Amino acid sequence: MTSVLELDGVSGGYGGSEILHGISLKVEPKEIVVIIGPNGAGKSTAMKAVFGLLQLNGGHVRLDGAEITNQEPQQVVRKGVCYVPQTENIFPNLSVQENLEMGAYVRDDDYRPRMKEIYELFPPLAEKKEQAAGTLSGGQRQMVAMGKAMMLEPKILLLDEPTAGLSPKFRGEIFKVVRDINATGTPILMVEQNAKQALNIADRGYVLVDGQNRIDDTGAALLANSEVAEMFLGGGKANSS
């Protein structure tokens, strides 16, 4: 079976500074895959490598087996990859509906049926479709950002720390939204600092340290891994607390 997304020995960084040192990972159909690691591990950089936001010095990025290494972001979007960055991921002065319409900018068909599906997936947005997106709660703004990306019916959705800065209540809501999106059949690659909650919903996970692969396993196995617990989860088995 061909992986939806594959990074194979990817190296690269910003300017003269190399951050990724030969990392490899895969996302299979219908999976949620989580990348965790300490600050500076290269988690977000790995995601930007997929989306064409930095020049790679080595390795390959493949979508459905086809090479997309070092392609421009607009090319990557048209091929079915949508990326929700951690910040500045909505148009705050536009309404919720206008944000979703912006998400459909590369579609050349009638996007209204898809918008109806997005409102069904995110009921709070349907209630506030005319409201300026910047006036919503942090959790609802993240829903707008994800809904905007989902307007393109992507082959894979990339989420960079979707719960960053949110209260525990809103974090829980966003993880539920991630599961709901995945339940529609959309594979998800997610970078997340809230390792325990992320691994609880993940099919598989990758631990990056200093721009290199450290551990990869199922979400459940990583939760029970003592090394992972010591590094990111406060010591002891993650699922014991």
Residue ranges, per PLM feature:
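Glycine-rich phosphate-binding loops of nucleotide-dependent enzymes
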Residues: 2-241
